[in-house]
Every structure is written in structure tokens, then in C-alpha cells.
Amino acid sequence: MADEHKHEESSPNLDPAVEVVERESLMEKLSEKIHHKGDSSSSSSSDDENEKKSSSSSPKSLKSKVYRLFGRERPVHKVLGGGKPADIFMWKDKKMSGGVFGGATVAWVLFELMEYHLLTLLCHVMIVALAVLFLWSNATMFIHKSPPKIPEVHIPEEPLLQLASGLRIEINRGISSLREIASGRDIKKFLSAIAGLWVLSILGGCYSFLTLAYIALVLLFTVPLFYDKYEDKVDSYGEKAMAELKKQYAVLDAKVFSKIPRGPLKDKKKD
């Protein structure tokens, strides 16, 4: 009986420790559940983000699959170089575009239709301008008015350097392209260059250089604007035309070009 009484007295002393252990185990279980929920929520959020990324990337991939004329991946404005020249050719600034196009048209009419010579025209313009300014400056002494303010004209250095740098890059690119064509590596480029030069020689025999330059300017002012407006229709027709050209080229390559012996540079490139 004494032992049982002792055991009953000692058992309540152990209850607080047991309660602490039970509380700690409960806290651990709760923390595990919270972590498990956090991981599941983070995984679900990451899954949602992945779904969003895939859904957002899907239209991009579809857009990249759309055929663009000449393999173009940038807008027409960027293809033209961007900045002021592209704005002029795309008629973004209508006053500037109209002024440039009108000035080119007047110059073409004067030199081609009226058969003016450039040096003669410049001399006549300078004679008229100097005579008007000289008479005006002397007439102000008699009519008691202020003389004309003739502005000082300075050609800035930076635009000329940029123009020269751009021309240098394009000339070097053209020379490297001609070198690659002449090396016999690509017969398609060779035939394209021959056909282009042949067409230019025919046009040069029919029209003067100034007329050809004016035609090129008219095309620059009209074709990009038309293409930007009807881009999808032009690209669809261009895709059909390119597919037909590839078929015809494949037939021509199988019958003719494949039988032509290739140069040593082509063999080295394959190795």
C-alpha cells in the first residue's frame, strides 16, 4: 500500500514533462503541415508561372513561324535604318517627306525634261541670289530700312562623318559579297548577281543614271509604305511565289547544276 501511495504521489510530478513533450510533438506536426502547404502552394504557383510563360511564348512561336518577305524579322521602319531617313521614306513627317520628294521631282524635271546641266543651273541660281542680295543691301541705304540678315551657314562635322562611316560599311559589305560570289562557293548567288547586273545593263541602256536614281527614289517613297499597309497579303503571295521558285530551282539544280563540277573551295568547306 505504501508503494502504491508513493507511485501515485510521483506520477503527478511527471505530468508536466509529458505535457511539454506532447506540446513539442504537436508543434512539430503543425510546422511540418505548414511547410508542406507552403511547398505545395509554391509548386502550384511555379506551375502557374510556367503555364503563363508557355502560353505567352506560344504566340511568339506562332508569330516567328509566319513567313516574312526576304526573311525579315524586324519592322519595315527598322529595316530602313530607323531615325530620320526611315521617317521620311515612311511618310511619318509629311512636310519633310513632301519637301524631299518635291525637290527630287523638280531636279529631275530640270535636268531630264528641260535638259538643264547641273553646273549651268548652279551658276544661274548663284547669279540670281547674289544679284538680289546685293541690290537689296544697297537699296536699304536709300529707303532707310535695315539690310537683309544673311545667315552664316556651317556644315557640321558629325553628320558627314556618320554618312562616310555608313557608306564605308556598305561598300565593304558589297565588296565582300562580290568576292564570295566570284570564289565559286554559291552558284545561286552567282546566278542572282549575273541576272541583276544584266537587268541593270538593260535599264542603263534605256534610261539615264539620273532617271534611274529618281525611279529608285520613287520606289523608296512608295513600296515600303504600301508593304507596311498590306503586309500580311504581300507576305502570303510572296510565300507562294518563293515556294514555286524553290521548286523550279530544285528541278534546274537536279538537271543542270548538279552536273557542273565544283571548285576546290567548296570541297574544303565541306571538309
Curated annotation (Swiss-Prot):
It is a multi-pass membrane protein. PROSITE patterns: RETICULON. The keyword NAD does not apply. Keywords: Acetylation, Endoplasmic reticulum, Membrane, Transmembrane, Transmembrane helix. Its main location: endoplasmic reticulum. The keyword Nucleotide-binding does not apply. Residues 1-10, 20-39 have a biased composition (Basic and acidic residues). The chain crosses the membrane at residues 95-115, 116-136, 206-226. Residues 85-271 form the Reticulon domain. GO terms for molecular function: mRNA binding. One of its GO terms (cellular component) is endoplasmic reticulum membrane. Residues 1-60 are annotated as: Disordered. PANTHER family: RETICULON, RETICULON-LIKE PROTEIN B2. Plays a role in the Agrobacterium-mediated plant transformation via its interaction with VirB2, the major component of the T-pilus. Interacts with VirB2. This is Reticulon-like protein B2. It comes from Arabidopsis thaliana (Mouse-ear cress).
